């Protein structure tokens, strides 16, 4: 109870709890039910069913009018935050027993944490990974369902990492997770800010709210942690305005603690100068130059030898689904990229344009937008595809609960009149490919 600083406690607290649960359907006798207010439902509406199923305690913002004699009621100001702190305490604060580093930003999170996992594994550590694509304990895969898991699952996963000998863990920290307090109660050794661009306005409402959500991550760091920010993104300084942590910077175009310069960008990789040392990397594009700088800076701030870090980084390949190249027998090249924001799509297409040979091969872009997500970026992404491509095919991504035709109609609004004859709309993604 001290971990959540309750406003009011009613009933006996001298009992051993079963599990911490926020879904009333999963409550068993002896469990603690935390009533969280969500975007789709309010957990307070399910307090009665939770008590009927034998909950030993209810944690909530508004106390119910009545409760069984054997059910303890705990009132808090923020149930979501309390859930995170309770989960951390329940699993004996696993994040304090390893070096946990998180990355937040619009683009680059998955590439950064995945390559950090590979880097530290090659450095000889057992490492945990929490990402959009997958979760890993060492090399053992744990299925991933969200960019950042719920607070209970997250602490359970970190506890499992500790039990299996992990010394480090790297995780993606989404804006949704921060606003929903999924990381409350966690102790971070460090935090990375990659960049911030147009995304998730369907959830946050405004771009300012999106920025504030990301900033929460750095506001919560303690004085022993480090904050590593992309200095070329003007909002990097905003992220660390109120942080107690030690701030370091990386950049390609500004003075920074970890300064990089792209010397050559080819279909085979990047030649870079980082803090005075020239290195060849297998990754492609300026956007990956930023990712590499963030990874390098993080490793050095975690105490690793700079030269050894650069040597290993030069041996690592790109992450699956991030600028993946497939070359057919006839010489046609396909590039697969996760790009799902206007800025990410622009970065990928500009990189492809810069890599075109003297023959100026045609760029055919197949792009779609997800359903039940920020609709304002749909015409923008279509316009970017037209600007940097010779031909464009608008197609389905994951429509979720929307009609694909409605999504494609939104995208079509961004097609310039002089590009209309270069654009096809094919809803079936397989057919488009």
Describe these PLM feature segments:
Residues 1-85, 89, 234, 256-264, ...:
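N-terminal leader/targeting and accessory segments in enzymes
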Residues 2, 64-70, 164, 179, ...:
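Acidic, Mg2+-coordinating active-site environments of NTP-dependent enzymes
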Residues 7, 69-77, 142-145, 244-251:
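Active-site regions of enzymes building and remodeling cell-envelope glycoconjugates
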Residues 38-41, 319, 351-418, 429:
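Active-site beta-alpha connecting loops in nucleotide-dependent enzymes
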Residues 47, 117, 158, 214, ...:
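Generic hydrophobic/aromatic pocket-lining and core-packing "Φ" positions
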Residues 49, 53-54, 59, 72, ...:
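P-loop/Walker A phosphate-binding loop and immediately adjacent motor/lid segment at beta-alpha junctions
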Residues 56, 189, 390:
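Receiver (REC) domain switch/active-site residues of two-component response regulators
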Residues 82-231, 235-243, 275, 293, ...:
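Phosphate-binding loop of NTP-binding sites
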């Amino acid at each position: 109870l001290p971990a959540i600083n309750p406003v009011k406690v009613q009933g006996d607290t001298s009992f051993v709890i079963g599990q911490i649960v926020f879904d009333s359907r999963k409550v068993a006798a002896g469990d603690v039910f935390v009533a969280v207010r969500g975007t789709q439902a309010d957990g307070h509406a399910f307090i009665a069913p939770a008590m009927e199923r034998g909950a030993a305690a209810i944690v909530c913002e508004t106390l119910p009018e009545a409760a069984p004699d054997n059910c303890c009621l705990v009132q808090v100001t923020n149930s979501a935050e309390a859930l995170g702190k309770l989960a951390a305490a329940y699993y004996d604060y696993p994040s304090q027993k390893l070096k946990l580093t998180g990355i937040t930003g619009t683009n680059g999170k998955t590439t950064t944490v995945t390559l950090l996992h590979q880097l530290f594994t090659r450095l000889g550590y057992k490492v945990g990974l929490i990402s959009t694509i997958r979760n890993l304990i060492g090399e053992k895969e744990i299925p991933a369902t969200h960019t950042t898991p719920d607070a209970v699952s997250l602490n359970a996963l970190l506890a499992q990492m500790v039990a299996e000998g992990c010394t480090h863990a790297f995780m993606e920290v989404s804006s949704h997770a921060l606003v929903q307090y999924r990381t409350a109660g966690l102790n971070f050794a460090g935090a990375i800010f990659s960049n911030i661009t147009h995304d998730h306005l369907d959830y946050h409402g405004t771009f300012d709210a999106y920025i504030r959500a990301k900033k929460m991550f750095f506001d919560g760091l303690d004085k022993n942690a480090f904050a590593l920010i992309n200095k070329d993104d003007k909002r990097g300084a905003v992220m660390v305005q109120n942080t107690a942590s030690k701030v370091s910077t990386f950049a390609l175009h500004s003075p920074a603690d970890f300064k990089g310069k792209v010397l050559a960008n080819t279909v085979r990789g990047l030649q870079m100068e980082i803090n005075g040392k020239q290195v060849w990397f297998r990754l492609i594009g300026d956007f990956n130059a930023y990712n590499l700088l963030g990874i390098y800076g993080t490793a050095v701030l975690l105490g690793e030898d700079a030269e050894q870090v650069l040597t290993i980084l030069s041996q690592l390949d790109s992450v699956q689904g991030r600028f993946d190249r497939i070359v057919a027998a006839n010489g046609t090249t396909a590039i697969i990229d996760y790009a799902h924001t206007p800025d990410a799509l622009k970065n990928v297409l500009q990189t492809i344009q810069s890599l075109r040979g003297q023959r100026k091969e045609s760029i055919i872009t197949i792009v779609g937008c997800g359903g039940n997500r920020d609709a304002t970026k749909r015409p923008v992404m279509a316009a970017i595809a037209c600007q940097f491509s010779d031909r464009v095919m608008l197609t389905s991504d994951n429509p979720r609960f929307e009609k694909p035709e409605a999504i494609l109609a939104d995208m079509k609004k961004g097609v310039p009149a002089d590009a209309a004859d270069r654009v096809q709309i094919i809803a079936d993604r397989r057919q488009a490919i």
